[in-house]
Amino acid sequence: MSSTTVRPSVNALAAPLVEALVADAAKLRLTVTANSGEARLVNAGATVLGSIEAGRRIAEICLGGLGTVTIAPTGPVAAWPYTITVHSTDPVLACLGSQYAGWSLADEGGTSGFFALGSGPGRAAAAVEHLFEELHYKDNAVQIALVLESASAPPASVVAKVAEAAGVPLEAVTFIYAPTQSLAGSTQVVARVLEVALHKAHSVGFDLAKIVDGIGAAPLSPPHPDFIQAMGRTNDAIIYGGRVQLFVDAEDADAKGLAEALPSTTSRDHGAPFAEIFARFNGDFYAIDSHLFSPAEVVVTSVRTGHSHRSGRLVPDLVERSFA
């Protein structure tokens, strides 16, 4: 990607979505804490019920205003018909430059034990991850939003760290947080079905500049009060029920190679519900083969030739086993 290309501000595009979420907090069953001189905190499921609609909107915020997220009663997994569909005309920036949960945030030196992965457009304002050097992108934002998969609000040390890294005052930061066990939390995680395909494309070395459009769909997983089960269901929705189509400005050989490299079937750990795999590795997330974190089925279409290349397969039985 050219460093001279004018790119949109993901925080500016997401800002009206954030304000709409805050304005509709009551009907979405969220709470908002906003004190003068402090960051704004949106509780979307930690100590409130939240909602699926809140999760859908949070997913669009995570995409930096560069994508749409819809929920409809159609999809490839018949037993669980409600499907989350994600589309972006700038999938690299939307998914990797904004939605990807790549910012590790911890209460360093504190006693809270807080840790969460930050996602959303605020990442691009801080640009502390090496990924942004590869993307040649940094968002010079005046207001930022960050989404945390967390059961608690970030402590003061994390709030200060984020504001400082992004170069904005505390009151210009909005944190939206919800655990995976919640309605909103599970919804926004499944809405990463397109993002995991982009992350996999990056990890296998495909030229990201050649990815020009993308769409993904996965079944809406029911929430579960247990974190491991909830995490398992959201992963299984994508790993065994997710379908993605990428449109690439590349020749067939490259498109075919990408299609063959992307799906979760390339992983040695494919074939069991994620919670069972997690237990098999004694809860060591990083011991699991990283190739597993991919959509079940992938279609890569070359816009140069018009040919499409398909790889992987849906496994509805494992989705059913996980969701039941």
UniProtKB/Swiss-Prot annotation:
It catalyses: 5,10-methenyl-5,6,7,8-tetrahydromethanopterin + H2O = N(5)-formyl-5,6,7,8-tetrahydromethanopterin + H(+). Belongs to the MCH family. It is an enzyme of class 3 (hydrolase). Catalyzes the hydrolysis of methenyl-H(4)MPT(+) to 5-formyl-H(4)MPT. Pathway: One-carbon metabolism; formaldehyde degradation; formate from formaldehyde (H(4)MPT route): step 3/5. This is Methenyltetrahydromethanopterin cyclohydrolase. InterPro entries: METHMP_CycHdrlase. Pfam families: MCH. Its EC number is 3.5.4.27. One of its GO terms (molecular function) is methenyltetrahydromethanopterin cyclohydrolase activity. GO terms for biological process: formaldehyde catabolic process; one-carbon metabolic process. HAMAP family: McH (MF_00486). Keywords: Cytoplasm, Hydrolase, One-carbon metabolism. GO terms for cellular component: cytoplasm. It comes from the Bacteria. It is found in: Cytoplasm.
